[in-house]
Amino acid sequence: MPPIALARSACLVALAGAVLVQADPVAAQAPAPAPFRVEDATIAGVREALASGRITCRGLVQGYLDRIAAYDQAGPKLAAIRALNPQALAQAEAYDADRAGGAAKPLGCVPLLLKDNYDTAELPTTGGSAALAGAQPAQDATAAARLRAAGAIVLAKANMQELALGGVSVSSLGGQVRNPYDLTRTPGGSSGGVGAGMAAGFALGGLGSDTVNSIRSPASANNLVGLRVTQGLISLAGIMPVSKTQDAIGPITRTVADAAALLQAMAGTDPADPLTAAAAGKVAPSYAAALKPDALKGARLGVVRVLFGTKPEHAEVNRVMQTALDALEAAGATLVRIDDPAFEADALNREDDVQTYEYKALMNGYLASIPNAPHKDLAGILASGQFHRAALESFLKAAEARRDGMAEPEYKARLGRIAAFKAHVAEVFAAQKLDALVYPLQKRLVVPIGELNQADRNGIVAGLTGYPAIDVPAGSSEASATAPAGVPVGMDLLGQPWSEAKLLGLAYAFEQATNLRRLPASTPPLEAR
């Protein structure tokens, strides 16, 4: 595995015993409180601890850096982190120096992992590709800038499936990301570094991108919450692109409430992304206000049966999902069976996906915007050979071979089929009076390391329609020698456009009723090692 470009010298101190967040000197005179566990911390919990003086922002950031030092390139060697931000500790100290000003911001001192396809002004954005090593954007992506304006600290850029083209999270710069719940398996993808890092307690929040599955797949595989928003709700300006038809971004977090908090900071119109014009008047005043434990009472949820597998390898996911469906009913939801072959994911991927038609023009445009990009077009990346050939070469060659993919008759035919499918999904919602559709994000458990195709995923429904979808922990497979607590399984809830508040409410009610989040055995509290 190539060495990771980690700016450790500016960020890390020697690991010494337990990672307990630095206490305020005044608070230290009081009886010692229980240790503050950064690995399970929430945004609300951190705000309270900072306000009370129980922790400092510097101590919080150091706590996460210590866990990264212990578990990313040591211990289980998760390989979730591509680069640390050398300014993170200084930014934390600035918060502590102006605690009143920082506390006034909704995300004051919230350390974040950003997938390495988010432009950042102080860190290269490489997409995990050796061909783009050192590529330095001139400014932050809009989403990153808004998070910082809300007080967040970019702690690190996360490893990912190279160029976001696949689902096993392997890259030429960062190597293979491991799933902390089963170190022999992949973490889903393409946002797998964010997924593994958030599961392992490397930060307080994470951000991913999703063309087909790529936020919700790592959420599903790592016992997390992943929200793909309505296309246009969050700006894509400064995000390394794959498909203008299918791309969206969103948070990956340990709780639904944290996802709502990050969404609130990012959502809204942006002149740099014309798609966001549709979001005018659509941003909820408070997504947190929708988080009610009884939100499932009276909800009508369509269970899309064609998105469940029927083969032996699907049995574990089906078992977990049945338990989750029972929990939805117990919480007051009405389940409506949807038997509709139009939702068949493999057919939608095969016949309607437009990534190879759009990728070349979009990537060439993005590379032209990076002042020092080592290659200025897709042809240059291909010619360099500096990418994970087994994972990417077939796609890159297919995309480059299209002289003008978006002018091809088949591309236009696919757009027509996408429009028809989107209209059909809207009709299903209306005819059945549904609040959301329900299905497993993956029909089977995430594949073992070494396989290059993350088979049997269902994310294409949201990818083609642009509808929002949230993935929440549904349970885990049976325990095994390599997965002491089982492999996590996620449940997708897909809603109509701009229904993020409703989806967050449904997901929150399920989360509160089930309480399924557990820290992986491979990354325990440091003092417990």
Predicted regions and their residues:
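Bacterial N-terminal signal peptides that target proteins for export
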Residues: 1-11
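Short, well-ordered alpha-helical
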Residues: 29-126, 130-133, 164-165, 275-279, ...
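Sec-exported extracytoplasmic/periplasmic mature domains
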Residues: 48-55, 65-77, 86-89, 93-100, ...
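Structural helix-boundary/capping segments
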Residues: 70, 200-302, 310-311, 322-329, ...
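Short helix-loop capping/hinge segments that flank enzyme active sites or metal/cofactor-binding pockets
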Residues: 108-127, 290, 295-305, 356-426, ...
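Short glycine/serine-rich loop/turn segments
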Residues: 108-249, 274-278, 302-306, 437-455, ...
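Gly/Ser-rich, acidic/histidine-flanked active-site/gating loops
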Residues: 118, 124, 246-248, 275-360, ...
